[in-house]
Amino acid sequence: MTTPDAFRDAEYIADVSGISYGNVANLTEQDANVVPRENERMRKLQLAAKVAFIDRLLRDLDILIYCELSALYYMDCSVILFAIRAIVQLIFFTPKAPPFDPTRNQPFIGAIFVSNIFCMIFHNFFTHPEASEATRGYLHGGLLIDFIGQKAPIPLFRLFLLDFLVLILDLVMLGLIVERVKTTGQTSTTSTEILRVQDHDSEERGVHRTRPESRSSVVGAELDETDGHITRANAGVGEQAEHTQLLADPSEDGHTPGAKNSHPLDAFSSGEAVIMNLGLFDVIRDQWKYSTTAPPARTSSYIPSDQTAAFLRARFGLQVGPDGRVQRIQS
């Protein structure tokens, strides 16, 4: 993930986002209503950068798995085993262009374990790569091309080790796909804070109602005195936090904090961002539970136009039902 291509993807996302260095940290108190929108933009930018890094890692792992399959083919010279794994890799794990984005509605667990366990059993009990003197001790095989493999005999432990490595890489790619689906499916969390409009009463009390406040704020006769204490307490806490920030993270000029010159993608560029916390057993359990759960009934919102409905009815005697399925008109 330290290749220039991954950072080029993230830099492109940063360029099109329109977020410059320090434009959020330099906002004043009068621009407090702009901060939530800027925070939402930064959050979307970071999610887009995370998806870009996951896509790059998926492509790199896909190439690595094909290289491992090629190495295994040169050791066992079995087109059947190579084709089984290559087809599974192509269908389930090879990244594809939109709209064929990866989803979790596929039998990943069955495809991974069935294909890899079958190849392991075949290598341990049925395949014994040997070569005769006619081939000078080298393995030959292939249906279309007579590839020359390695020199026989091939240790079974090496075959089993490569089989296990392919299995681990498949599970890692499954974890990345699950994380990508979760990242792209995230929605903006609804804040419990509301934005209130400034009125005359708040203006007389010296309270800024445009600042976000909690829904559980107490409304009563003692509001004036309580708001006064809260305002003074918040002012003291704000001054203390600002003082601590100035002492802890001074900038070069000594007037503004260094955080104002930051960018949402600094963590990705510096390598400090965590793409995902991978636990193989957790990934297997979550995907298995997701696969065994019955999907909810889908209601199609597709409504054909009058011209399309008339054409289907006149030409083929078909109609689109309420569930979106094409049905034959019963005469």
UniProtKB/Swiss-Prot annotation:
Alphabetized UniProt keyword annotations: Endoplasmic reticulum, Glycoprotein, Membrane, Transmembrane, Transmembrane helix, Ubl conjugation pathway
Biased composition (Basic and acidic residues): 197-214
Gene Ontology CC: one annotated term: endoplasmic reticulum membrane
Membrane association type: Multi-pass membrane protein
Domain of life: Eukaryota
Pathway assigned in UniProt: Protein modification; protein ubiquitination
Phenotype when the gene is knocked out: Impairs growth on solid media under hypoxia and leads to triazole susceptibility. Impairs virulence in a murine model of invasive pulmonary aspergillosis (IPA).
Transmembrane segments: 63-83, 107-127, 159-179
Region feature Disordered, mapped onto this chain: 197-225
Location of the protein in the cell: Endoplasmic reticulum membrane
InterPro entries associated with the record: Dsc4-like (IPR038967), DUF1746 (IPR013715)
Glycosylation site list: 26
Chief place where the protein resides: endoplasmic reticulum
Keyword Oxidoreductase among UniProt keywords: no
GO biological process: SREBP signaling pathway
Quaternary state and interactors: Component of the DSC E3 ubiquitin ligase complex composed of dscA, dscB, dscC and dscD.
Function description: Component of the DSC E3 ubiquitin ligase complex which is required for the srbA transcriptional activator proteolytic cleavage to release the soluble transcription factor from the membrane in low oxygen or sterol conditions. Required for growth during hypoxia and triazole drug susceptibility, as well as for virulence in a murine model of invasive pulmonary aspergillosis (IPA).
Protein name (database record): DSC E3 ubiquitin ligase complex subunit D
